[in-house]
């Protein structure tokens, strides 16, 4: 991602990941469709805005949905760029899809004050959300 893009990432409270220099105008032609994750959408809106400021004839359509839709739409050609807030699965990379990380975000797990849940590890939270542990007493 460009230096200018990383400034946008940082300004929107995401963690920068890479820097490849400044934006430059490429005089693009045609339309690009970007689709996927609602958690990526706010920063993508800013990136598109900055890109269009330099490439005034750029035609970019942004479609907000979810990570899986973004990945599937990229795979089937419905969109040009998919947005995902998760890593690609092996089955998705086997289709030839390639992930380019533009930022990192944080996820918080919040429980009610009356819930005795405390100090769970990432693996324990994963067990809860994947269904491996369906009851609190099953969390090990």
What do the predicted segments below correspond to?
Residues 1-140:
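Flexible loop/hinge segments at secondary-structure junctions
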């Amino acid at each position: 991602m460009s230096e200018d893009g990383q400034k946008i990432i940082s300004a929107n409270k995401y963690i920068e990941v890479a820097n490849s220099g400044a934006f430059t105008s490429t005089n693009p032609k045609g339309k690009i469709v970007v689709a996927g994750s609602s958690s990526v959408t706010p920063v993508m809106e800013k990136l598109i805005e900055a890109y269009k400021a330099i490439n005034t004839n750029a035609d970019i359509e942004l479609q907000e949905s979810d990570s899986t839709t973004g990945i599937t739409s990229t795979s089937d050609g419905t969109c040009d760029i998919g947005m995902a807030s998760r890593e690609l699965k092996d089955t998705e990379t086997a289709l030839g899809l390639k992930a380019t990380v533009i930022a990192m975000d944080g996820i918080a797990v919040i429980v009610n004050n009356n819930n005795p849940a405390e100090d769970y590890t990432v693996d324990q939270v994963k067990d809860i959300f994947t269904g491996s542990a369906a009851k609190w007493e099953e969390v090990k």
